[in-house]
Amino acid sequence: MVAIIRRSPVVFDVSPSREEKRDHWTVALEYPGEGEGPWITDLCHKTRWDVQDGDLLSLASETLPIPEDYGRVALSQEMSVNRMNRTQAAVWHFTENPGPMPNVAAFTETTEATVFLALYGPQVFAVTEKLTSLDLGGPDTEPPQLVQGPFSHVPCQIVVASKGDTPGILLTCSRGYARDMVHAILDAGREFGMRPAGEERFKQWCNQF
């Protein structure tokens, strides 16, 4: 019998102090010396779907709240549902067991095709300012909001999840950019003390949603 092994394309210079195996992924729960933030967390093991349909809102339900307006986001502790345009939305799950993808042609799983990162904590927008001309922390951005554009010169989907005392963003991009993206983020965040953090730190941040 062939064992299935799923590997995140994200690699940090430090190894996790606690980890677990889950659905053939090795999930980092905690890193040594996570500090006071800001943090970067690898979420590549989290289930992600792309949804495309000419009548997108017909697929909405209590468990899949697709926003009516483009650029808006339905954000909770369980998921982020991002309205991209008239016919397309992205679904990013945060839970360990989100359930099966609907058996409908409109849904495509993108988990292993993309990078999924969370950047959050104090000074996180000072870090992002060094990596993009998009004004993610500016007054015209009302969380939760989807922003699509270049981040470290890479096309990304970015959700500005929160500002205030617990600011942060979520972002996805093509899997092939993982190494360069992580290197650029940590390099930009070095002066602010940015460090890798595990899934448990991310869960604490998600409690505000």
Each language-model region and where it sits:
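Basic, glycine/lysine-rich polyanion-binding surfaces/domains
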Residues: 1-209
